[in-house]
């Protein structure tokens, strides 16, 4: 993706360098050419790791892999079925994103040639995984980021094992960081705290230049925490790590609720609770709550700005 965009940029530079000859090109034709070569940000949401186990419904749509087969022109979160549908619909409505879901029973791969291989996407969203990644999958995820991909991780609280297989999201994510076969020393510079924090309204740091806090979808002032956890930063392992939203009374390397980092040529974001992304809609039988629009936080802006940043938009 980066290569193709760079190619377009070089072509544009060559056009400008032709001087007066460039004036002979009709402006409408140039605009039409630019429109046809615009490339959408490709985002893959994971559903291969028990994201709908128990009372969870962390999908953008039940139509998988392509949510547009449920509704090609969604207007609200109810256009698609899933507790993350508001997130997906907001991206879809911009016309700048191409969304897919990795269905249950699938394997996460990188460089396999499969249609849903990570190499075909700019950003991979893993919302509260409940099944441990295999050794090959952990390697694939790390290499994806290392080579320019964006990874969005959402954890939940300690003992949030929804499918009773002995693994919850904090343990699964920490295992990814320390047992991936590529870099086993916290490659992204943070770890998930093994905690169950009942409630808080974490606040954003004061950083006018941060692209996630001040992005294309609005300004982030804070988030909500409703049975979740936090992260410990380890800048000695990766100096690019940064906490941008913190639990009340916390700062520095402890108590970070939303974290960003870089690794290789890729980017990473992590959120300490699934509640802020929950839009309160989804499949029947799930007890869901609308954290997406909770006035105690600016959760929609946080999720969407982070997605844009990870996709290098």
Model-derived segments and their meaning:
Residues 34-313:
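Short, surface-exposed patches at the edges or C-terminal ends of soluble domains, predominantly
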Residues 17-36:
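C-terminal region of N-terminal signal peptides and the immediate post-cleavage residues
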Residues 1-11:
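Bacterial N-terminal signal peptides that target proteins for export
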């Amino acid at each position: 993706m980066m290569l193709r965009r760079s190619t377009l940029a070089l072509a544009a530079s060559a056009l400008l360098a032709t001087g007066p000859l460039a004036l002979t090109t009709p402006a409408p034709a140039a605009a039409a050419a630019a429109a046809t070569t615009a490339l959408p940000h490709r985002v893959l949401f994971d559903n291969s790791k028990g994201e709908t186990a128990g009372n969870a419904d962390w999908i953008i749509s039940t139509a998988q892999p392509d949510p547009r087969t449920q509704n090609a022109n969604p207007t609200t979160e109810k256009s698609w079925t899933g507790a993350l549908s508001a997130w997906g619909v907001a991206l879809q409505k911009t016309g700048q994103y191409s969304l897919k879901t990795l269905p249950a029973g699938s394997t996460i791969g990188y460089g396999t040639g499969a249609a849903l291989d990570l190499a075909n996407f700019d950003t991979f969203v893993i919302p509260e995984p409940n099944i441990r990644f295999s050794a090959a999958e952990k390697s694939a995820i790390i290499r994806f980021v290392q080579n320019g991909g964006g990874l969005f991780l959402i954890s939940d609280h300690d003992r949030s094992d929804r499918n009773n297989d002995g693994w919850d999201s904090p343990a699964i994510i920490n295992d990814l960081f320390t047992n991936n076969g590529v870099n086993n020393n916290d490659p992204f510079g943070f770890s998930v705290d093994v905690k169950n924090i009942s409630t808080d309204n974490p606040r954003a740091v004061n950083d006018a230049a941060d692209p996630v806090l001040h992005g294309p979808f609005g300004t982030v002032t804070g988030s909500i925490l409703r049975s979740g956890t936090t992260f410990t930063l380890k800048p000695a392992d990766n100096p690019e790590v940064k906490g941008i939203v913190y639990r009340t009374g916390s700062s520095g390397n402890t108590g970070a609720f939303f974290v960003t980092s870089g690794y290789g040529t890729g980017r990473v974001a992590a959120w300490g609770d699934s509640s802020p992304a929950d839009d309160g809609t989804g499949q029947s039988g799930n007890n869901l709550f609308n954290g997406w629009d909770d006035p105690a936080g600016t959760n929609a802006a946080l999720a969407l700005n982070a997605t844009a940043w990870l996709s290098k938009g």
